[in-house]
């Protein structure tokens, strides 16, 4: 409204209009309307709502209709209507708003008024209700308000209508004089009319008293009906009239409530109230707009002339009409007094019924009657008779006889009824199908246009609800309005959708208020049901309208007396009709039958409702049609207009009061419904869910009717009305909607089928399991595809429960019925999978689904569970089913609804992505690795490692990305692992059925609240299980459940049966046991996402620790750990094939005993995996990768390091299961390996400790062993989650500090982060923290500088970083960054302080995967500052050497941490100790002084050159000359030409990059910086390559490996994205190896750490084993070539189950680990692996060394850094040393694993370690292998250079140089032996640790 537009925004318009029509009309009309509403008395109020609120009203309209449709320009195109339309345009700006108003009036007068009354309507309605506290008062006051407002209208219309135009003339459209005259006349007449209205209001007050009783009866009846319908919504919804009016009312009330809430959110609720207000203001505005026709005519200057002429003619007629109106007023007063109670009460009751029936329609009827009459009379008055007369003349003259008009009106009524049915249908469908609503809106608006057009014709006889003129004018206006509708419906489609929503609500309200909207629709239904009654009413009303039309026409005709007489007759007819309505209401009240009452009320109301719906439609069309009508009304005599006005004012008042009463009733009903919904959401879902189920049943039979009835009762209405007349339209519209729904269903079905198909592949495997335990695993595994689909099915069946489950799964997937329909059809498609689900939408979804859904419901919101268990959003489902109810829920779920739509869009996109990704499995494999990186980045970057994506839905894009990636990966894993999964699942199914039946209850108890039904859609989301889990959305939790599978999919995409097993089991079992894994584990790890292992490892761990009780509580963590540890234990015990889901599924594969064992070991191994005592070796705390990231990292670490040897130790089946687990839980693979390793892990822990602390200290090793063991136990509890969460800020601050402090040493940070990534488990992290603490404490005592990091070395920081690393395990890089940042800040600073080794160690060993490829060069470049530090470390070299243990410990912490993370922490820690010894001896022995001397020698040559060019600008030529000079000098200074080649290239590229920043600057300005840059680069590179030379010198096998590395480096060149490694990979690798072999002993001895740090050649101990990103950066990420080679070689060479691909990276890492572990544990297997890996490693490992960034190759070459070297070197030496390996089996296995891993990582082409730390985890594989290989094969592994040990940039060496370097490295092997703990000491330690590190491998980084 003008003033009330604002209040009307929400729902207030509705309340405001009814009460506004009473007192608020005066207030509003006086206060609000007349500013804008002068144009039309009632309409000006409406239109002021429209004008002032034309935009505001459009806003209001938009506000109201946002759900169905914007409703913005409901009838904007209706502007064609001349005067009223022009004004309506100005006010409504479109006839769309007229229809909005009409629909709103229909809906709002009753529905929205109550809704608005219930809601914020009261503010406006307060003023409105001031006069009319009750409906009768509303009527009287409406009449009084209308009279007052019309009197004030006249005044205000004079005053405000002028808006500066004192006269209603507002000679805007017409001659100012004529308009002024006309408006003055109109004002006078309006004054008269208002006076009469005041009199009538007095009369109406009496009538209102009567009507109050009647309305009270109506209220009671409707409330009873509403209550009955609330309880039994679908009892009457079975048929078109079957949907009880109350149910429809409730639905529409809920729809309206939801709309209003939504529109309150959208601030577009006004449109619905505006419908009424517009109706009121239409009547008022029509009066005023008649008076304002001048203003309208201003807009319609063309029509001004015509209308002005007509106005002149009509002025005469108007005078007649004034007389007639006076007579009519008297007669009307008499009639109102006489029949006013009955006609006024009866017909008002009937109007009320009509209003309540049409709630807006009847209000419009009353209002429209008044509006039509008033605005007609006002149109004749404001529009001097010309407007009404023109309308009336055009109607009368142009129109047919009144009989024909009555026929037309009746036809139009039928059309309107049909269209109303359609409208209701589409109101329903607009909720279900906004598109359908739009189309329906078009049709309905056309119908409503016709209705409003007829209303334009009709309302003119004030008494005639359907004005006789309305017939012709109806036809005309129908043509006009239909044309306008055609246009306006298109524009107004939004509004019409709003109107339809309102109509929907109105239909429901009408069903309630009319006793049934169905009777509007059921008017035909009632004509059928209450045919005599309804038809009598309708016939009578039609007759009455005919009479009133004819009499109205006669009154509109020139015969004023006849018009009056006919008006009296019409009034009497209306009174009879209203009496019948009242009788019907009484019958309704008496019958309490929603149906009979509906039929009765509808019967009586049908005619009125039709008339009122017509007029309601006419009323917006009065806004529209009032253009035509006002034009025609302008032609009407003002007297007739006044009479019409008064009559219609009275009618409007009565009807408004009735509508208000009905509105109140409806509001009460809505409130009751809402209360019932709130109180009995189950009943709602049962009533509406069961009704939806019934509806679903009948909707299945008559889905349109039932679903639509569910939606808005519209289908029923549509059936009722549209069956007779709207059959064509309705059938078409419904057919369109059904087609749309089917398309959406097909779409969703396809999506669901895609998901289900994939899932059925899994389920096919699990379905054997699922077959027996469909409700258990199938329901969960399938429930992921099927709960979304089952819920979709339930939605298809319209079982709100299922739909609600989908809503929870999808967040709001069924937020809209369209979604529901789509989902419903998906569900219907899904029934094959979950037929019971769809068959039993609520109750008979399998218990598993029920529990899952129920648990998901509980988990999500503890929403009431329907029998379906999907019930949680049951009200929401009802919302969808029952739009009103659904919208009621939408209050709460609107965000969810939009989110559901988004998720559906996501799901559609994801399904498309799934389809695409199914065809791009290799890409997805790469994406799997990228996904791990992305999960690291996203999780860490977005909301923190755990909460980043999960906690914030704000990261929905991240969810989408991860979701899509996960879906891709899941689909790939499903497809790839389908057969293997099926095989193993068949085994597991038998046991899984049992376990899942066992697990399902507890897991469902725990996690069913977060079942993974959306997994099919969100399965990709499951990739960041925590992120998804952090969404707290069951679907996301389910996503999380897939995260392990996804992880495994990436890791084990191709050949891992267990990966398919793990991928599927987690998807299926986690789906099946989302409680355990997803819901619980993820819930527990919500803030602590375990992208790879979160759901598995945590759950399994906790499951193991806490079998069932803690499973429920901690199964969130336990389930995650369980998955991971189940993998470990599965591999170690062949039981922990999976986490809980892996366990169930993998157990299914494996054995029932395996299942039980696996479940036990899911718990145990997950516990051990979460650093719980390994089931195999309880003393051993296997890595706990609580976070998926930790799992992934641990899996990578395990794969790369420990898991290999452990897996080798484990059986092949265990390996398979573990690979499955690894695939399932990338960390799980390592974890699974770790349990087996745990026996060795004890030793390995000690070994890792020895390693880590052999650098830093063996004391710290012991401490770490202690800490690791204690931490193993502590970390198994999921402490990393809480610790990380508690310490996240601290961790991040420390990491930020670490990063900021090491900005100049990106490589240090990268490798540090990589190494930290290796710290996959809390155990490893805590051990690393303790080691760091010890190191820091030692260094603090030894070196104050070393103590700089103690702050970050705090155990809390460690724990935080551990916790952090848990997410960083999910975000392998990020959290490891965080941890490494914390840890490096500690360890690195210690190491840095100790010597550059820390920086280089950290940077080298901790390869931050994300930076791995890019940062290799960048890191070297940024190691400039690291050079400075390394020089500082050179100065601290003695200090560093003295603290070599600490330094080695820091690098060893990193290396060992990486080793711990890497799994064979023994191997890696051995390599780290070696490298720490190498760092301590060779790495620190990188003579920084020698480097300084060398650099000085170079700079001595460079400085003079620069001095010569000091005045020159640093041009590219000059810089190139400097670079070439430096390179030449470097070559001169370099001992190895081979190294110089590589180093020259790498250094040249680095120098080029470093010097590039000086380009354009004057040399004298940047000369110093240039020299510093050059010196730093030289120092970094020389130190690094000397380290690499030392490493190369450490073993001759490194020469072979150097060849391999060179080959691999060639491959890496193509793949590695290291700045120069790619281009210089081959040569540099050789040179690097040679150089490393030669120089690393020196440089390592001098300051390997410094050089490593500075040169990114982290000290050998800091195994430079690059993460897959670094070593196989492009290969692993971009291609599976590395993986393929490695896999091929591994698979070729040995029983390596490594399905190394990008996905297999983890899987391959695990398999390599497993295979290596198995084979190594089987010394033959390890021999084979060694042979494999020798061949592969000689190929792939040397290739890997080559492919690995050159520093990786060098590291591999450098025995002191045996991690990488062990790959290639271990491949050779492992084969040779396998038997001789001091790490019998374990270390050899680890070395083999390392070889496999390094092979994959180093042999990037093969990416066998794609999942290996080299590629994915920074140092996991290489350090890992180096450690394992070194520990077990100390001498040989000394020859092995960790990839991390490899300088990030290798000096280019020719093969000859590399061979020389390798020879020197062979010599250095003894150095590395010495370095590794006195040479033999650490061998022994490492050998001892090899087994302990098997545990630490199990513990992954726990050893570290």
Swiss-Prot record:
One family name in Pfam for this protein: PCM1_C
InterPro entries for this protein: PCM1_C, Pericentriolar_Pcm1
Superkingdom as given in the UniProt entry: Eukaryota
GO biological process, alphabetically ordered: cilium assembly; intraciliary transport involved in cilium assembly; microtubule anchoring at centrosome; non-motile cilium assembly; positive regulation of intracellular protein transport; protein localization to centrosome
GO CC annotation terms, alphabetical: centriolar satellite; centrosome; ciliary basal body; cytoplasm
UniProt biased composition (Acidic residues): 442-452, 535-544, 806-830, 1649-1658, 1680-1695
Compartments, as annotated in UniProt: Cytoplasm, Cytoskeleton; Cytoplasm, Cytoskeleton, Microtubule organizing center, Centrosome; Cytoplasmic granule; Cytoplasm, Cytoskeleton, Microtubule organizing center, Centrosome, Centriolar satellite
Coiled coil: 171-212, 301-334, 403-429, 562-592, 636-686, 731-768, 895-927, 970-1000, 1421-1447
Disulfide bonds: none
Biased composition (Basic and acidic residues): 43-60, 520-534, 1103-1117, 1151-1162, 1616-1625, 1881-1897
Compositionally biased tracts (Low complexity): 338-348, 471-482, 1173-1182, 1800-1812
Keywords: Cell projection, Cilium biogenesis/degradation, Coiled coil, Cytoplasm, Cytoskeleton
Region Disordered: start-end pairs: 1-135, 159-179, 265-303, 338-361, 376-407, 430-489, 520-559, 686-706, 773-840, 991-1018, 1063-1082, 1088-1225, 1616-1741, 1774-1838, 1865-1904
Primary localization class, coarse: cytoplasm
Comp. bias intervals (Polar residues): 107-118, 280-298, 349-361, 461-470, 687-706, 779-804, 1064-1073, 1093-1102, 1141-1150, 1668-1678, 1698-1720, 1728-1737, 1779-1791
Family as reported in the entry's similarity comment: Belongs to the PCM1 family.
Entry function: Required for centrosome assembly and function. Essential for the correct localization of several centrosomal proteins including CETN3 and PCNT. Required to anchor microtubules to the centrosome. Probably involved in the biogenesis of cilia.
PANTHER family, per database record: PERICENTRIOLAR MATERIAL 1 PROTEIN, PERICENTRIOLAR MATERIAL 1-RELATED
Subunit structure comment from the entry: Self-associates.
Protein name per the record: Pericentriolar material 1 protein
């Amino acid at each position: 409204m003008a003033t009330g537009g604002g209040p009307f925004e929400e729902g207030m318009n509705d309340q405001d209009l009814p009460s506004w029509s009473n007192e608020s009309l005066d207030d509003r009309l006086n206060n609000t309307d007349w500013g804008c509403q002068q144009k039309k008395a009632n309409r000006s109020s409406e239109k002021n709502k429209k004008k002032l609120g034309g935009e505001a009203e459009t806003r209001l309209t938009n506000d109201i209709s946002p759900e169905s449709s914007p409703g913005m320009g409901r009838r904007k195109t209706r502007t064609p209507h001349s005067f009223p339309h022009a004004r309506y345009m100005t006010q409504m700006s479109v006839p769309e708003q007229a229809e909005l108003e009409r629909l709103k009036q229909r809906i709002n007068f009753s529905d929205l008024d109550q809704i608005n009354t219930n809601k914020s309507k009261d503010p406006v309605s307060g003023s409105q209700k001031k006069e009319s506290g009750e409906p009768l008062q509303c009527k009287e006051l409406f009449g009084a308000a209308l009279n007052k407002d019309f009197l004030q209208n006249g005044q205000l219309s004079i005053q405000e209508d002028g808006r500066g135009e004192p006269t209603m003339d507002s000679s805007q459209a017409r001659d100012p004089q004529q308009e002024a005259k006309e408006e003055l006349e109109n004002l006078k007449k309006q004054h008269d009319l208002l006076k009469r209205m005041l009199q009538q209001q007095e009369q109406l007050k009496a009538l209102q008293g009567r009507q109050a009783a009647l309305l009270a009866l109506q209220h009671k009846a409707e409330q009873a009906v509403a209550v009955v319908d609330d309880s039994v919504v679908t009892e009457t919804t079975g048929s078109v009239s079957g949907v009880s009016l109350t149910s429809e009312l409730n639905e529409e009330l809920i729809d309206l409530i939801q709309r209003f809430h939504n529109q309150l959110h959208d601030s577009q609720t006004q449109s619905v109230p505006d419908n009424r207000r517009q109706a009121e203001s239409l009547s008022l505005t029509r009066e005023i707009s008649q008076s304002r026709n001048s203003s309208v005519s201003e807009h319609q200057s063309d029509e001004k002339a015509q209308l002005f002429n007509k106005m002149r003619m009509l002025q005469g007629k108007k005078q007649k009409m004034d007389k007639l109106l006076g007579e009519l007023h008297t007669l009307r007063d008499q009639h109102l007094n006489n029949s006013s109670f009955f006609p006024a009460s009866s017909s008002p009751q009937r109007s009320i019924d009509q209003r309540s029936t049409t709630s807006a329609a009847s209000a419009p009827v009353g209002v429209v009657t008044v509006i039509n009459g008033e605005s007609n009379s006002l149109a004749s008055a404001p529009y001097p008779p010309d407007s009404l007369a023109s309308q009336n003349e055009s109607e009368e003259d142009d129109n047919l006889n009144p009989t024909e008009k009555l026929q037309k009106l009746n036809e139009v009524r039928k059309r309107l009824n049909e269209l109303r049915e359609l409208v209701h249908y589409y109101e329903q469908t607009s909720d279900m199908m906004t598109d359908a609503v739009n189309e329906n809106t078009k049709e309905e608006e056309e119908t409503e246009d016709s209705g409003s057009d007829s209303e334009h014709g009709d309302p003119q006889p004030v008494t005639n609800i359907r004005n006789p003129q309305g017939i012709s004018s109806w036809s005309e206006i129908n043509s006009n309005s239909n044309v306008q509708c055609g246009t306006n419906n298109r524009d107004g489609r939004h509004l019409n959708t709003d109107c339809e929503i309102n109509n929907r609500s109105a239909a429901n309200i009408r069903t309630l208020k009319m006793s049934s909207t169905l009777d509007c629709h059921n008017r035909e239904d009632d004509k059928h049901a209450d045919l005599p009654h309804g038809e009598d009413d309708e016939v009578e009303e039609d007759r009455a309208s005919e009479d009133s039309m004819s009499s109205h026409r006669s009154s509109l005709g020139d015969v004023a007396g006849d018009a009056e007489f006919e008006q009296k007759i019409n009034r009497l007819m209306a009174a009879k009709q209203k009496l019948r309505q009242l009788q019907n209401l009484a019958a309704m009240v008496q019958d309490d039958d929603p149906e009979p009452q509906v039929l009765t009320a509808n019967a009586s109301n049908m005619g009125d409702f039709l008339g009122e719906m017509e007029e309601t439609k006419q009323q917006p069309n009065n806004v529209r049609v009032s253009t035509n009508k006002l034009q025609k009304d302008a032609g009407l005599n003002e007297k007739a207009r006044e009479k019409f006005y008064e009559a219609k004012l009275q009618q409007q008042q009565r009807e408004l009061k009735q509508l208000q009463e009905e509105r109140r009733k409806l509001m009460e009903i809505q409130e009751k419904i809402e209360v019932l919904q709130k109180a009995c959401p189950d009943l709602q879902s049962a009533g509406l869910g069961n009704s939806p189920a019934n509806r679903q049943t009948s909707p299945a039979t008559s889905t349109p009717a039932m679903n639509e009835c569910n939606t808005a009762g519209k289908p029923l209405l549509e059936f009722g009305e549209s069956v007779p007349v709207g059959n064509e339209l309705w059938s078409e519209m419904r057919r369109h909607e059904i087609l749309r729904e089917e398309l959406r269903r097909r779409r969703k079905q396809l999506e669901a089928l895609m998901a289900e198909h994939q899932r059925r592949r899994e389920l096919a495997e699990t379905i054997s399991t699922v077959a027996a335990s469909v409700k258990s695993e199938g329901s969960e595994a399938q429930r992921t595809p099927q709960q979304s689909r089952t819920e979709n099915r339930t939605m298809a069946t319209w079982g709100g429960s299922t739909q609600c489950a989908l809503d929870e799964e999808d967040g709001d997937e069924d937020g809209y019925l369209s979604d529901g329909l789509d989902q419903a059809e998906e569900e219907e498609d899904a029934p094959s999978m979950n037929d019971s689900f769809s068959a039993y939408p609520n109750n008979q979804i399998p218990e598993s689904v029920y529990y899952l859904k129920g648990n998901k419901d509980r988990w999500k919101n503890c929403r009431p569970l329907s029998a379906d268990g999907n019930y949680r959003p049951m009200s929401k489902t009802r919302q969808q089913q029952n739009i009103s109810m659904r919208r009621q829920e939408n209050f709460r779920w609107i965000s969810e609804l939009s989110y559901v739509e988004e998720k559906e869009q996501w799901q559609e996109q994801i399904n498309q992505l799934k389809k695409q990704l199914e065809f791009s499995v290799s890409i997805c494999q790469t994406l799997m690795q990228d996904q791990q990186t992305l999960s690291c980045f996203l999780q860490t970057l977005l909301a923190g490692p755990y909460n980043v994506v999960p906690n914030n839905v704000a990261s929905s894009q991240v969810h989408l990305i991860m979701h899509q990636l996960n879906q891709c990966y899941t689909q790939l894993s499903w497809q790839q692992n389908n057969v293997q999964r099926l095989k193993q699942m068949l085994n597991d199914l038998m046991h899984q059925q049992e376990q899942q039946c066992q697990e399902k209850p507890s897991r469902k108890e725990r996690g069913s609240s977060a079942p993974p039904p959306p997994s099919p859609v969100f399965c990709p989301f499951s990739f960041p299980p925590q992120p998804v889990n952090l969404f707290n959305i069951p679907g996301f939790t389910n996503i999380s459940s897939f995260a392990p599978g996804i992880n495994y999919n990436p890791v084990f995409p191709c050949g891992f049966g267990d990966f398919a097993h793990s991928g599927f089991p987690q998807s299926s079992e986690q789906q099946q046991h989302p409680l355990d894994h997803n819901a619980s584990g993820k819930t527990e790890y919500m803030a602590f996402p375990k992208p790879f292992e979160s759901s598995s490892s945590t759950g399994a761990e906790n499951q193991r620790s806490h079998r069932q009780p803690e499973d429920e509580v901690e199964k969130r963590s336990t389930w995650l750990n369980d998955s991971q540890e189940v993998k470990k234990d599965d591999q170690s015990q062949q039981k922990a094939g999976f986490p809980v889901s892996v366990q169930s599924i993998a157990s299914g594969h494996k054995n029932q005993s395996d299942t039980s064992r696996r479940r036990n070991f899911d718990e145990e191994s997950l516990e051990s995996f979460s650093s719980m005592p390994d089931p195999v070796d309880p003393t051993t705390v296997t890595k706990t990768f609580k976070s998926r990231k930790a799992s992934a990292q641990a899996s990578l670490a395990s794969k790369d390091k420990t898991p290999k040897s452990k897996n080798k130790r484990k059986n092949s089946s265990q390996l398979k299961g573990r690979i499955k687990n690894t695939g399932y839980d990338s960390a799980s693979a390592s974890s699974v390996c770790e349990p087996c390793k745990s026996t060795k892990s004890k030793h390995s822990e000690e070994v890792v400790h020895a390693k880590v602390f052999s650098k830093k200290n063996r004391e710290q090793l012991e401490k770490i062993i202690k800490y690791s063991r204690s931490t193993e136990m502590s970390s198994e509890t999921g402490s990393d989650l809480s610790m990380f969460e508690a310490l996240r800020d601290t961790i991040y601050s420390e990491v930020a500090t670490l990063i900021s402090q090491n900005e100049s040493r990106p490589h240090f940070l990268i490798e540090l982060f990589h190494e930290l990534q290796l710290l996959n488990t809390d155990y490893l992290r805590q051990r690393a923290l303790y080691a760091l603490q010890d190191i820091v404490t030692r260094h603090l005592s030894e070196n104050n500088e070393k103590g700089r990091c103690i702050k970050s070395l705090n155990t809390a920081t460690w724990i935080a970083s551990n916790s952090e690393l848990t997410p960083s395990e999910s975000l392998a890089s990020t959290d490891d960054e965080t941890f490494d940042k914390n840890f490096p800040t500690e360890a690195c600073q210690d190491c840095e302080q100790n010597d550059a080794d820390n920086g280089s160690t950290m940077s080298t060993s901790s390869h931050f995967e994300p930076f791995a490829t890019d940062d290799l060069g960048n890191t070297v470049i940024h190691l400039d500052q690291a050079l400075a530090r390394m020089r500082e470390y050179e100065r601290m070299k003695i200090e560093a050497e003295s603290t070599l243990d600490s330094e080695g410990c820091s690098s060893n912490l990193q290396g060992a941490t990486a080793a711990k993370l890497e799994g064979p922490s023994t191997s890696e820690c051995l390599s780290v100790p070696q490298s720490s010894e190498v760092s301590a001896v060779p790495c620190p022995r990188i003579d920084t002084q020698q480097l300084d001397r060398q650099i000085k020698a170079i700079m001595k040559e460079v400085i003079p050159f620069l001095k010569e060019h000091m005045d020159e600008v640093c041009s590219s030529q000059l810089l190139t000359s400097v670079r070439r000079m430096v390179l030449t000098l470097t070559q001169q200074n370099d001992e190895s030409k081979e190294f110089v080649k590589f180093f020259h290239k790498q250094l040249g590229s680095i120098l080029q990059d470093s010097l590039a920043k000086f380009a354009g600057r004057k040399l004298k300005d940047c000369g110093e910086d240039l020299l510093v840059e050059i010196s730093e680069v030289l120092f970094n590179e020389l130190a690094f390559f000397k380290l690499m030379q030392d490493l190369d010198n450490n073993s001759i096998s490194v020469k072979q490996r150097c060849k391999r590395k060179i080959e691999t480096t060639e491959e890496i060149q193509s793949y590695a994205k290291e700045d120069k490694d790619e281009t210089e990979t081959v040569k540099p690798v050789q040179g690097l190896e040679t150089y490393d072999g030669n120089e690393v002993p020196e440089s390592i001895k001098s300051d390997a750490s410094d050089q490593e740090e500075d040169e990114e050649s982290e000290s050998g101990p800091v195994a430079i084993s690059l993460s897959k990103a670094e070593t196989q950066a492009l290969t692993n990420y971009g291609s599976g070539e590395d993986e393929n080679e490695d896999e091929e070689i591994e698979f070729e060479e040995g029983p390596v189950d490594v399905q190394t691909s990008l996905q297999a990276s983890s899987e391959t890492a695990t398999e390599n680990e497993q295979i290596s572990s198995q084979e190594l544990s089987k010394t033959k297997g390890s021999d084979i692996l060694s042979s494999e890996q020798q061949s592969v490693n000689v190929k792939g490992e040397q290739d890997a060394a080559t492919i690995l960034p050159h520093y990786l190759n060098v590291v591999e070459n450098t025995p002191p850094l045996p991690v990488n070297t062990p790959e290639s070197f271990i491949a050779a030496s492992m084969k040779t040393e396998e038997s001789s390996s001091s790490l019998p089996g374990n270390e050899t296995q680890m070395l083999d694993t390392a070889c496999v891993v390094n092979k994959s990582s180093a042999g990037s082409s093969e990416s066998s370690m794609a999942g290996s730390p080299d590629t994915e985890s920074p140092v996991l594989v290489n350090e890992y292998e180096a450690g394992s290989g070194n520990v077990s094969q100390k001498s040989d592994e000394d020859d092995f250079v960790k990839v991390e040990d490899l300088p990030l940039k290798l000096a280019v060496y020719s093969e000859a140089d590399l061979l020389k370097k390798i020879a020197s490295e062979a010599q250095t092997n003894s150095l590395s032996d010495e370095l590794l703990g006195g040479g033999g000491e650490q061998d022994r330690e490492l050998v001892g640790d090899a087994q302990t590190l098997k545990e630490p491998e199990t513990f992954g980084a726990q050893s570290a």
